[in-house]
Amino acid sequence: MIETSNITALKNVLEVALLTSHEPLSLDDMLRLFTEKMERATLRMLLDELKQDWAERTMELVQVASGYRFQARDEYSVFLARLNPERQAKYSRAVMETLEIIAYRQPVTRGDIEEIRGVAVNPNVMRQLQERDWIDVIGQREVPGRPSLYGTTKHFLDDLNIRSLSELPPMEDFTQQEIPI
């Protein structure tokens, strides 16, 4: 059993690491913070307690695809947007349709995307999605020519604030979803 004072110290270490990290931290990342071996169950318990500690505050501890992070609660986003009045990037219909096909039907080839959309996929669309780190090549189809198979990345899931593809909104709502730049 962990002593109460020790629990507070451990939570403080987790809190400062999560608050100062630019990226979500995985369980493995957080386990490396401590010199003594810690069980994953203990770490999860500490994270649950930390989440409860922040329950009535302006920020919340959330789990996304690549780990855990602190973020502002949704009700404060309107105020924070005033600090950075930059407009959100508008993505073309072709970009959004291509991303939708990849997200919901992965793994897919460019040929699959072209067949579904009924038009050729502009290489710039694929490049834009890869530069944004929303899609990546995840393999090759075992057919002549071995075309690349595309799938979404953890960064894509993180930007949507979800942990897995099963949490994606219904397909018909996807293109209306606001995706942060």
Where are these regions (language model features)?
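Phosphate-centric recognition/catalysis
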Residues: 1-5, 9-10, 94, 155-181
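Short alpha-helical segments that sit at the start of domains
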Residues: 1-13, 70-96, 131, 178
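Short capping segments at the starts of secondary-structure elements
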Residues: 17-26, 38, 104-109
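Short acidic, hydrophobic short linear motifs in intrinsically disordered regions
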Residues: 24-33, 107-117
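Short amphipathic alpha-helical interaction segments
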Residues: 38-47, 117-134, 144-147
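A short, conserved structural fragment
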Residues: 51-62, 132-142
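Short, cationic-aromatic polyanion-contact patches
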Residues: 64-83, 139-162
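Glycine-rich active-site/cofactor-binding loop and its immediate structural neighborhood
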Residues: 87-114
